[in-house]
Amino acid sequence: MQNSSKYQCYATLCANLLSLCYGAFAGWPSAAFLLFQSADSPFEGGPLTTNEISWIGSILCIGGLLGNLFFGWLSDKLGRKLPMLLAVLPMLISWILIILAKNAVYLIFARFLGGFAGGAIFILVPLYVTEISEDRIRGSLGSCLILFWNLGMLLAFISGNYMSYNTSPYIYIGLIIVFLILFMFLPESPIYLMKSRKEMEAEKSLRYYRNLRKISQPPEGFKTEMEKLKCEYIEEKSGSDDTALSWSDFNNPVARRVIVIGIALMALNQFCGCFAMVNYTATIFEISGSSLSPNMSAIIVGIIQLVGSYVSTLLVERAGRKLLLIVSAFGTGFGHISLGMFCYLKVLGCNVESFKWVPIASFSLVIFAASWGVLTLPFMMLTEITPVKIRSLTVSFCMVTLWIFAFILVKYFPIVAAILELHGCLFIFAACCFSGALFVLIFVPETKGKSLESILAFIEERTKK
């Protein structure tokens, strides 16, 4: 680790404690739902119905959508830091409701509030990390969002297997408190401060994140970076008497191109089918002849996801974002096709006994390939390609589309799977993956090692062609 990146890495780790807690919140139902639908259900009314389970699962997406809208607006008004601290409140309340839950209503409210906090996390953490990072490590730090999210899910799978459903929340409440204590002392993003015309505070913040607080004469690299921020600030200030957003800021070729790319990346993130397929983990292990319990199967999937997202942090500044996305999408698509062919041949009555290894191998490929690219990189790339002035609202809007896509998948995937069967859904997911890879190849710019200014200049140049 170079000395200048010390506090950037520290701040990224602190911010992503929220990602870890939200990953645990998202993974918590994996083991809990099995208990809630069994004869040993701890609730007064007995086992939860399929409809109640459906709403407990899908209400998270509605909360996330509203959280995106609210915190996207708030991040333009109050910055990145304060809204991240405020996002702790709904997350804390959601875990407390789970501890106190007596029926499905408690859990529905808890999942809504947790989703609301998740909406904040998926917009604020990428914004914050992108704006404090040097170009050379921005990709590695940005990919930590999903790495910590997957770590949280794995912790939830493990704790759900060995602890009661209302005991593990105490662990995550403790982690949230640790986040509060550590993060409240970090400075605001220097880019947001400069955008808010607080030049002295912006320089102080940039000095902190470049580990230059105690150096009276900073190196030329720092001076150059500070001048770039000033130029951007002066250009915005002199270009208009009012820095408030207007429709023209969004209704121009560059903004429209960025928004289309953002929505496409969010669609690829969801319709690659990885999240939907996690619900079929136990089924896939069963048709492979595995005797593992559903909980142990989930833990194995969690480990594969974690390793895949860690690979992303290692390769993103070496191979580049674009290549990783394309290879990830193709790998995920091929995994879906091979698993779909196995399931289809089994439906036709073919003898597949000698190919029982295919489901687990294919499923592992889907999870692993998706975790190093299509699940990890879209959030970081969205913040990299978006102009500073419209960044908060554009990222918020694209994240809203993500939650809409997620809600559609969670709510209606079981219905479509019942009609088309599993193999039909897998072939659709494969088509989405290959289409997404082609879109990335043609339209998405490479951002590896480039400054945010040069990325936008490249997009403007491509838009004019």
Where are the predicted features?
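Cytosol/matrix-facing amphipathic helices and coiled-coil assembly/linker segments
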Residues: 225-226, 230-235
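Short intracellular "coupling" helices and adjacent cytoplasmic loop segments at the cytosolic face
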Residues: 209-224
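Alpha-helical transmembrane bundle of multi-pass membrane proteins
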Residues: 1-207, 236-465
